[in-house]
Amino acid sequence: MKSTVEHLSPTRVRINVEVPFDELKPNFDRAYKALAQQVRIPGFRPGKVPARVLESRIGRGPVLDEVVNESVPAKYLEAVNSSEVRTLGRPDIEVTKIEDGDVIEFKAEVDVRPEITVPAFGELKVSVDDVEVTEEEVNEQLDELRARFGTLAGVERPAQQGDFVSIDLSATVDGQEVEEAQTSGLSYEIGSGQLIDGIDEALIGASEGETRTFTTNLVAGEHAGKDAEVTVKLNSVKERHLPEVDDEFAQMASEFDSVDELLSDLRERLGRVKRMQQGMQARDKVLEALLETVEVPLPEKVVESEIDVRKHDAIHPFDHDEDRFGEWLEQQGQTREQFEDETREEAEKAVRTQLVLDTIADAEDVSVSDNELTERIIYQAQRFGVSPDQYVQQAQQSGQLGAIYADVRRSKALFSVVRQATVTDEEGNELDLDELFGTQAGEEQGEQAEGTEATDEQSAKADAKAE
C-alpha cells in the first residue's frame, strides 16, 4: 500500500492511498463468503457456492463493492497510523479509482491537530483573591446549623419572608389545565427560591385559607416558555424558632462541648473551602493567561461538531421544539443571532483549550492511571445519580470512555502548568502551589469524610430530638 499526505491548511490534510489487489485477497475471501450466504443457487448449500459460480450469477460488481466497503476504512486507518498526522473527527472519503485486478485508489480529507507552540510556563503570572474568613461568614454557617435544629410552630398572622407554609397549586395556560402543575399540601419556605417565579410575592401577606393568583413564565415541561396563570391556596403558616447559641447547642449540633470549639471548627472548614477555591481560581486564571499567549488554528469541522452538541443540549429541555426555544430566548432578552454567536464563541474556546492541553500533555508525557480514571468515573456517576457500573456501560455505548480519559489527561496537564506558573495573592505574596495542590486532594477527601461524619451525627441528633 502507498500513501501520501497533502497539507491543505494548518488543520486539514488530504491522504491519498493506493491499495494493490494482491493485498486484498483476505477481503475477497470474506466478500465471497458473505455474498454466498445471501444467494440461493440450486445444487449448492448456502455459503458453499464457489467464487466463479457466484460471480457468474451476481456479477463482479457486488463483489468489488463488498471489498471496497470493507477494505477502505481499514486501509485509511493504516495510512493514518503510518503517517505523523493526528486526525480529529471523521474523514470525508472518496474512492477515485477501481482498476479490477490491479489497484484501488481513494482520498480522505480530515481535520488534524495543528502544530502549536506553547510558552515557557514559568513566564505565566496571575493574581488570585486572598484567603480570608470573616466573622460574617462564620455567623452565616452558624445560622445554617441553627436552622437545621430549629423548630416550627404555627402562627396566626399573614405569611412573611422565611415562613414555612403548606399550599395547594394549580395552573392554566391559554385556559387549559397544566396537569404537572397540580399539587396539594406542598411544603415551602417563602424566599427559598425553590418554586416558580412570583410565588413569594403572592404568598407574602396572605392569610391562612386565602387564595391568590399570579402570572409566571414556565421554564420546564410541555409548556416551557409560556405564560401561565397560577392559583395558590395558603393552607397553613409556621415560623421557625432557632435554638440559642450556647454550649448546650454546640453539644447537640456537633461533636464539640463548647461554642468556642464549634466556631473554631466552622472557621477552619471555611478556610479549607476558600483555599480550594483559591486553587481553582489559580487554575482558571492560568488557563486564560495561557490561551491568550498561544496561537491556535481551529479545525472548522471540529468546531462545528462542538457547536452542534451545545445547540442540542440547549434545545433538549424544550423537546427540540425550535419555536418554544425561540420564545424562551426572547423572554431571556436574547436574540437567536446572539445565541448563535455566543455558542460559537464558547465552542471555539472549548476546542482551543482542548488542543492546547493535548499539546502540553504530549510534551509533558502525561499519563492517566487506572485509579485516576476510576476516580473520575465514580465522581461522574455520583453527579448523574447512577452507579459506576451503569455509568461505564452508558459511556461505552455512547463511545465516551475515550473522552473521559482525555478529560482526565487534560486536567493533569493543566495542573502541571499551574504548578510552574507564578501565582500571587492580592498583596503580591507568591503562593506555594506545591503546598496548595499537593494537599488539595487529601483535603477534599478529608473534608468529605468529615462532612459525612458531621452530617450523620447531626442528623441522628435531630432525629432523636424529634422523637
UniProtKB/Swiss-Prot annotation:
GO terms for biological process: 'de novo' cotranslational protein folding; cell division; chaperone-mediated protein folding; protein transport; protein unfolding. Residues 426-467 are annotated as: Disordered. Residues 426-435 have a biased composition (Acidic residues). Its EC number is 5.2.1.8. Residues 436-452 have a biased composition (Low complexity). It is an enzyme of class 5 (isomerase). Consists of 3 domains; the N-terminus binds the ribosome, the middle domain has PPIase activity, while the C-terminus has intrinsic chaperone activity on its own. Involved in protein export. Acts as a chaperone by maintaining the newly synthesized protein in an open conformation. Functions as a peptidyl-prolyl cis-trans isomerase. PANTHER family: TRIGGER FACTOR CHAPERONE AND PEPTIDYL-PROLYL CIS/TRANS ISOMERASE, TRIGGER FACTOR-LIKE PROTEIN TIG, CHLOROPLASTIC. This is Trigger factor. It comes from Saccharopolyspora erythraea (strain ATCC 11635 / DSM 40517 / JCM 4748 / NBRC 13426 / NCIMB 8594 / NRRL 2338).
